[in-house]
C-alpha cells in the first residue's frame, strides 16, 4: 500500500489536462505507441468533437522510480463549471492533485474554485505550469501568480508541456515523493467509496470504486449500504486502458466491479460498498448529492416513445449522477419529463447524448430555475416551483423567492467596464473588485441564477473578447418581483412556452418572443395572433398573416355581386377554420426562445 498513489488533475477548460494525461500514460508505458491518440481518456465521441472532458475517467499506471515499482491511479476530471460535481467526486477518491495552469492564460476562475475544493479535502497540491513551449507563454509572471495563490516556493512549480512531453518525468517524480500514500487498514471490514458507474448493455452496471479499508475478493458477497442490496462480485479488476481482471483489490487501490446489476436505481454514486457477512458500520462521509440548477421539460417528438425515453434517461442517469428527472405532462406536448441539469452546457450535452446514444429525438422546453412561492394563505410555507405552470395565481400569491449566486469573474483590466455593464443588465450587484495584477481584475457580483442560465456565458465571452473566465456558487434565496409570462397562440395558451421573468424585463422579452415566433411558425390558411400576456393583460402582439387563395380568379367580367358572394363565402370558411384550426409549433421555435438576443 505504501507504493500506491491516487491523484487527480484539476485545471480550467483548455489548460491542457487531457493532453498532459496522454503524456503521463505514454511515459509510464500504460499505452503502447500504437494505441496512443489525442484525448485518450475522453472516450465519448461528443467529448472528442467538442474537445472537452465531460466525465471523469480513472486509469491505472505502473512506474518504476529509483528501483521501486509504484502504482499510480490517475483520475482525469472535467474543467467546465457545469461539471464541477464530477470534479468533487474525483477529489473525494484521491490524496493529491496536479494543479495545471496554462503559461499563456494564467490562473482562471475555474482553477481557483477547483483548487478550493481540493484544499477542503486536504489534498497535496502539485503546481504544474503547462504549455511553456508556446510563443505567447509568460512563465515568470504566471509563476508569481501561482505563488500568490498557493503560497508555495518558486522551485515547487514544475514546468511542463503536454505537447512535447517536456517535464513529464519531473511530474511523475513529484507525484511519488510529495503525494502521501493512501491510509487504510487491510485487516478491517471492507469499506469502499463508489465514485462512478457506467452502463454496459451486455454485462449490466460497472461500478468504479476506491477501497478505503479492507479488501474485496472475486466471488465475495458484497452489500451496497445506501440501498442495502447484496450481490456477488462476479468480476473485479483494475482499470488500465482496458479492464484487467484481478482476484483481489486491497485498501488504497481503485478498481471496477461487475455483478450483473441491471437496475439503474440500485447503484448510487457516493455510496459505500462493504462485505455482506461482516459489514462495516460506518459509511464514508463527506459526499453530498448534487443539486440541479436548471430545469427544463424533455418530451418525445412522438408520444408513443415515452417509455423508451424513460429507459434512455435511466441509463444516462447511471453514467451521469447529476441528471434528475420526474414525469410530467403538458397540454401542448403530451407526456414527458421535467429534468434537472447543472447548467446549459449540461442540458445541451444530455440532449445530444439522447440523440446519439439512444436515437431519441426530443423537444426541450424553455429552461428555468427552481423558485420558492409563498401564498397569502400560508405566508410562512414555501412551495418549490420547478415549472412555471405550477405557480399559484397572482391573486393568491404573496411573494416569490429566486436563487441567487455569487459570481466570480476574472478578466483583463481593459474589459472591466463591458463586463460590469453586462452584469448590471442581468440584475447583478457588484460586491467586490480586486486587482490581482495590473492587468487582471477579479470582480464579484451577487446575481440571480435565472439570469445566467440563458446566454450569459456566451455574452461574457463576447464583451471580453474571450478573455473573461467565470465561476459561480449558490448563496441562497431572495425575494424578487417575478411575473409569469404566457404565450398565447390563436388565443390558447401554450404551456410549454411559459416562463417566469422579472417584472422589469417582461415587456422586452414578451415582444421579442412574439417576433421570434412570428418568424418560425409556418403560415396557415387563417390569421394567427401571437400574444404575450401577464395574467389577463396582453403586453405584446404579432400576427401571422393568412395565406390566401384567389377565389375570384375564375370570374372574368360580369357582375361584382358574383365576386362578392365568393369572397363572403371564403371569409366564413376562414372564420370557421380559425375556431377549429390548431397551430403546430416547430421544434426550432422552442429552442429559439432561448436565444432571444441573436
Curated annotation (Swiss-Prot):
- Which CDD domains would you find in this protein's record? EF4_II (cd03699), EF4_III (cd16260), LepA (cd01890), lepA_C (cd03709)
Which intervals hold domain tr-type G? 2-183
Q: Where in the cell is it found?
A: Cell inner membrane
Q: Name one GO cellular component term.
A: plasma membrane
- Membrane disposition: Peripheral membrane protein
**GO function term, MF aspect, one:** GTP binding
GO term, biological process aspect, one:
positive regulation of translation
Pfam families recorded: EFG_C, GTP_EFTU, GTP_EFTU_D2, LepA_C
| Protein name (record) | Elongation factor 4
Native organism taxonomy:
Bacteria, Pseudomonadati, Bacteroidota, Flavobacteriia, Flavobacteriales
Amino acid at each position: 500500500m505504501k507504493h500506491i498513489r491516487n491523484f487527480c488533475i484539476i485545471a480550467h477548460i483548455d489548460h491542457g489536462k487531457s493532453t498532459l494525461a496522454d503524456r503521463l500514460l505514454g511515459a509510464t508505458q500504460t499505452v503502447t505507441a500504437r494505441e496512443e491518440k489525442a484525448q485518450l481518456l475522453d472516450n465519448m465521441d461528443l467529448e472528442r468533437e467538442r474537445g472537452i472532458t465531460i466525465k471523469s475517467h480513472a486509469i491505472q499506471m505502473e512506474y518504476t522510480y529509483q528501483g521501486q515499482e509504484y502504482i499510480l491511479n490517475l483520475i482525469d476530471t472535467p474543467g467546465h463549471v457545469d461539471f464541477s460535481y464530477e470534479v468533487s467526486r474525483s477529489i473525494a477518491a484521491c490524496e493529491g492533485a496536479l494543479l495545471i495552469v496554462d503559461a499563456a492564460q494564467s490562473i482562471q476562475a475555474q482553477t481557483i474554485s477547483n483548487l478550493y475544493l481540493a484544499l477542503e479535502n486536504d489534498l497535496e497540491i502539485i503546481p504544474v505550469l503547462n504549455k511553456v513551449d508556446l510563443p505567447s507563454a509568460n512563465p515568470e509572471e504566471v509563476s508569481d501568480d501561482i505563488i500568490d495563490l498557493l503560497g508555495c516556493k518558486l522551485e515547487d512549480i514544475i514546468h511542463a508541456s503536454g505537447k512535447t512531453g517536456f517535464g513529464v518525468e519531473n511530474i511523475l517524480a513529484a507525484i511519488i515523493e510529495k503525494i502521501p500514500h493512501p491510509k487504510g487498514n487491510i485487516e478491517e471490514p471492507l469499506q469502499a467509496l463508489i465514485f462512478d458507474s457506467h452502463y454496459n448493455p451486455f454485462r449490466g452496471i460497472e461500478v468504479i470504486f476506491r477501497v478505503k479499508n479492507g479488501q474485496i475478493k472475486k466471488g465475495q458477497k458484497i452489500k451496497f449500504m445506501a440501498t442495502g442490496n447484496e450481490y456477488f462480485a462476479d468480476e473485479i479488476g483494475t482499470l488500465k486502458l482496458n479492464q484487467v481482471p484481478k482476484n483481489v483489490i486491497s485498501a488504497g487501490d481503485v478498481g471496477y466491479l461487475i455483478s450483473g446489476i441491471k437496475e439503474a436505481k440500485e447503484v448510487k454514486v457516493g455510496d459505500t460498498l462493504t462485505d455482506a457477512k461482516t459489514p462495516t458500520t460506518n459509511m464514508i462521509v463527506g459526499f453530498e448529492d448534487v443539486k440541479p440548477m436548471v430545469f427544463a421539460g424533455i418530451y418525445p417528438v412522438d408520444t408513443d416513445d415515452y417509455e423508451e425515453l424513460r429507459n434512455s434517461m435511466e441509463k444516462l442517469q447511471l453514467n451521469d449522477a447529476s441528471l434528475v428527472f420526474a414525469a410530467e405532462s403538458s397540454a401542448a406536448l403530451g407526456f414527458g419529463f421535467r429534468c434537472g441539469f447543472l447548467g446549459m452546457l449540461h442540458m445541451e450535452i444530455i440532449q445530444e447524448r439522447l440523440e446519439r446514444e439512444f436515437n431519441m429525438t426530443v423537444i426541450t422546453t424553455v429552461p428555468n430555475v427552481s423558485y420558492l412561492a409563498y401564498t397569502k394563505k400560508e405566508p410562512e410555507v414555501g412551495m418549490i416551483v420547478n415549472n412555471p405552470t405550477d405557480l399559484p395565481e397572482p391573486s393568491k400569491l404573496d411573494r416569490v423567492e429566486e436563487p441567487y449566486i455569487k459570481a466570480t469573474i476574472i478578466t483583463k483590466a481593459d474589459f472591466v467596464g463591458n463586463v460590469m455593464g453586462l452584469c448590471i443588465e442581468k440584475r447583478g450587484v457588484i460586491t467586490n473588485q480586486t486587482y490581482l495584477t495590473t492587468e487582471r481584475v477579479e470582480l464579484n457580483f451577487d446575481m440571480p441564477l435565472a439570469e445566467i442560465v440563458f446566454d450569459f456565458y456566451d455574452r461574457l465571452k463576447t464583451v471580453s473578447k474571450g478573455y473573461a473566465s467565470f465561476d459561480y456558487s449558490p448563496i441562497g434565496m431572495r425575494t424578487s418581483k417575478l411575473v409569469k409570462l404566457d404565450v398565447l397562440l390563436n388565443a390558447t395558451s401554450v404551456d410549454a412556452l411559459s416562463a417566469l421573468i422579472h417584472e422589469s424585463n417582461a415587456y422586452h422579452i414578451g415582444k421579442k418572443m412574439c417576433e421570434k415566433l412570428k418568424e418560425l411558425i409556418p403560415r396557415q390558411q387563417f390569421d394567427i395572433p401571437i400574444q404575450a400576456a401577464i395574467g389577463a393583460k396582453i403586453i405584446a402582439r404579432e400576427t401571422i398573416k393568412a395565406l390566401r387563395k384567389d377565389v375570384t380568379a375564375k370570374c372574368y367580367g360580369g357582375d361584382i355581386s358574383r365576386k362578392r358572394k365568393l369572397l363572403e363565402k371564403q371569409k366564413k370558411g376562414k372564420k370557421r377554420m380559425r375556431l377549429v384550426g390548431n397551430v403546430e409549433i416547430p421544434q426550432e421555435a422552442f429552442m429559439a426562445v432561448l436565444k432571444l438576443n441573436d
